[in-house]
């Protein structure tokens, strides 16, 4: 038995005072790298064949990720087995060099500007990419925002795509008096303003053609060009306002100027209004040769028109097209003819010229009491008149909405939805033209119109901006329509009274209210008397106004 190795009994530690293993030293114990933050479920690395694509390292160990102890290796039993593809082979796209190289952080070209590191050359603070340059998207300057365009567009969703131009160039000699942002204006209120009192009524109105109410998409009617003129002079150029200003009132304006101020919180484009203060009298007027009377198109849309100036869909071209459509439509839906009856007011049209055919329009010069010391006199207008079933005369304000390109405007197709879903079409227009519709409503309320007629006019072809068709009409009561579009007249009167009070506190002179082109605020400037004179010479209209203004000051 001596040639066998001796049997040595192993040492077994017996726990005499408790249950379970005894204390054993950690010597020669196998060690597996681990991390306390590792998720439980290590076995899923080799049990589940599907990987988590969103969190690829969800179950990977921080310190032992390179350890292949638990890795699964697949071994093919039959190396000669091949799977035959029976589908149609897809043509592979050619390799595009430098198609996506997010790791090149230096010398990245952004929309015609160069970026070096985290500094952008050619773009100031607040420009493309913000103040952090290309690396402003996240911590490392790449990732989700890099895939969207290197410029951190996640933080620019509400920023204007293109900086808008100001309606008038602010000169160095203009003095800024006040800056009022829209949130402050929205908190204003002037309740219990009574309806205006008629002082003078002028002009003549033609009757509305009720057959136009039958127009629909299937029975459309071509829009005709009406060779008529509507004179829209400014406040100071109005002879009736000049006459009334000598005996009554201390604030004078027109309905479109008042509507612009009342609805300023809904506007995006820049506009300006000239103010003449003479003692206790204030004249709100518009500049000569300005685009104040032109209608805007898709001003409040998410993507307003941004085509170049020469295009038919540029903001300037669309504005002129909408103005002409509105003028022609307001006359075509009336009963035109020498034999047709007309409703004449007390005085004739004050802007009548010999040899010129005037459009159907009547003017009401009305007076409002805006407090103890503010009396407003404004010129308002009607476009037509209609007889109700009871035989009562009702005055009508006629306006037209125009469709130019539903795909480019991202709006509803009128020819498909106007007859069946007219509410959806109107909702789309309220979203894209909120400011324009609000101003039309304010003008109808100020004039005391009984009805507001809205026409839907579309292009015959989206590429032809000269031919149009009428697809339908819709009528509203101005007060009810103001409630539907969330137009608060108490706030509108409060905004007007606030601006008038600011001007009344200033010394006599010339001022200008301007909507900031890129910020939701309005600015008040003190400007020289000859601020808008070309080459230092006054034009004929301005020279005629000087004696009147001097007489008012005296």
UniProtKB/Swiss-Prot annotation:
Report what the protein is called. Answer: Eukaryotic translation initiation factor 3 subunit D-2
Keyword match Hydrolase: no
Keyword Cytoplasm among record annotations: yes
Tell me which family the UniProt entry assigns to this protein. Answer: Belongs to the eIF-3 subunit D family.
The written remark on domains in the entry is: The RNA gate region regulates mRNA cap recognition to prevent promiscuous mRNA-binding before assembly of eif3d into the full eukaryotic translation initiation factor 3 (eIF-3) complex.
* Primary localization: cytoplasm
Segment Disordered: which positions?
530-554
Q: Which PANTHER family match?
A: EUKARYOTIC TRANSLATION INITIATION FACTOR 3 SUBUNIT 7 (PTHR12399), EUKARYOTIC TRANSLATION INITIATION FACTOR 3 SUBUNIT D (PTHR12399:SF0)
Q: How does it assemble?
A: Component of the eukaryotic translation initiation factor 3 (eIF-3) complex. The eIF-3 complex interacts with pix.
Region called RNA gate, residue ranges: 291-305
The task this protein performs is described as: mRNA cap-binding component of the eukaryotic translation initiation factor 3 (eIF-3) complex, which is involved in protein synthesis of a specialized repertoire of mRNAs and, together with other initiation factors, stimulates binding of mRNA and methionyl-tRNAi to the 40S ribosome. The eIF-3 complex specifically targets and initiates translation of a subset of mRNAs involved in cell proliferation. In the eIF-3 complex, eif3d specifically recognizes and binds the 7-methylguanosine cap of a subset of mRNAs.
Cysteine pairs forming cystine bridges in this chain are: none
List GO BP terms, alphabetically.
cap-dependent translational initiation; formation of cytoplasmic translation initiation complex; regulation of translational initiation
Where is this protein localized, as stated in its record? Cytoplasm
An example Gene Ontology cellular component term from the record?
A: eukaryotic 43S preinitiation complex
Q: Which UniProt keywords apply?
A: Cytoplasm, Initiation factor, Protein biosynthesis, RNA-binding
Q: Which GO terms describe its molecular function?
A: mRNA cap binding; translation initiation factor activity
Q: Which gene name belongs to this protein?
A: eIF3d2
Q: Which organism is it from?
A: Drosophila mojavensis (Fruit fly)
């Amino acid at each position: 038995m001596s040639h066998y190795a001796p049997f040595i009994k192993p040492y077994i530690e017996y726990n005499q005072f408790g249950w379970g293993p005894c204390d054993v030293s950690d010597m020669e114990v196998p060690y597996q790298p681990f991390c306390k933050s590792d998720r439980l479920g290590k076995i899923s690395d080799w049990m589940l064949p599907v990987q988590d694509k969103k969190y690829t390292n969800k179950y990977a160990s921080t310190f032992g990720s390179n350890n292949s102890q638990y890795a699964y290796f697949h071994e093919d039993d039959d190396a000669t087995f091949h799977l035959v593809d029976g589908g149609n082979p897809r043509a592979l796209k050619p390799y595009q060099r430098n198609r996506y190289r997010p790791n090149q952080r230096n010398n990245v070209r952004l929309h015609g500007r160069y970026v070096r590191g985290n500094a952008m050359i050619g773009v100031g603070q607040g420009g493309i990419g913000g103040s952090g340059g290309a690396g402003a998207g996240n911590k490392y300057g790449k990732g989700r925002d890099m895939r969207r365009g290197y410029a951190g567009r996640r933080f620019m969703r509400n920023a204007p795509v293109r900086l808008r131009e100001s309606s008038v160039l602010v000169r160095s000699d203009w003095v800024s008096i006040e800056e009022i942002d829209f949130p402050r204006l929205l908190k204003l209120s002037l309740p219990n303003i009574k309806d205006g009192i008629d002082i003078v009524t002028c002009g003549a109105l033609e009757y509305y053609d009720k057959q136009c109410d039958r127009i629909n998409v299937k029975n459309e009617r071509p829009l005709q060009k009406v060779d008529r003129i509507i004179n829209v002079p400014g406040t100071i150029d109005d002879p009736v306002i000049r006459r009334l200003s000598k005996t009554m009132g201390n604030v004078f304006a027109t309905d479109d100027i008042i509507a612009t101020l009342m609805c300023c919180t809904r506007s995006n484009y820049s506009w300006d209004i000239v103010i003449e203060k003479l003692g206790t009298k204030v004249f709100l007027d518009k500049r000569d040769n300005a685009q104040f009377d032109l209608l805007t198109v898709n001003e409040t849309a998410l993507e307003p028109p941004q085509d170049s100036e020469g295009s038919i869909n540029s903001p300037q071209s669309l504005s002129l097209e909408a103005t002409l459509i509105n003028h022609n439509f307001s006359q075509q839906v009336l009963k035109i003819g020498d034999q047709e009856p007309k409703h004449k007011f007390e005085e004739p049209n004050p802007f009548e010229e010999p040899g010129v055919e005037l459009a159907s329009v009547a003017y009401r010069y009305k007076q409002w009491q805006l407090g103890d010391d503010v009396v407003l006199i404004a010129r308002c207008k009607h476009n037509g008149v209609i007889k109700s079933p009871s035989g009562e005369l009702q005055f009508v304000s006629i306006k037209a909405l125009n469709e130019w390109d539903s795909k480019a405007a991202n709006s509803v197709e009128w020819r498909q939805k106007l007859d069946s879903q007219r509410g959806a079409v109107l909702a789309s227009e309220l979203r894209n033209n909120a400011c324009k519709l609000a101003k039309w409503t304010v003008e109808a309320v100020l004039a005391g119109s009984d009805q507001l007629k809205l026409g839907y006019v579309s292009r015959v072809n989206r590429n032809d901006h000269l031919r149009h068709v009428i697809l339908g009409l819709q009528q509203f009561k101005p007060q009810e329509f103001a409630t539907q579009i969330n137009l608060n007249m108490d706030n509108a009167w409060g905004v007007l009274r606030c601006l008038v009070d600011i001007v009344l506190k200033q010394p006599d002179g010339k001022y200008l209210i301007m909507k900031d082109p890129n910020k939701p605020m309005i600015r008040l400037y003190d400007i020289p008397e000859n601020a808008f004179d070309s080459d230092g010479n006054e034009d004929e209209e301005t020279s005629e106004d000087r004696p009147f203004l001097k007489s008012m000051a005296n």
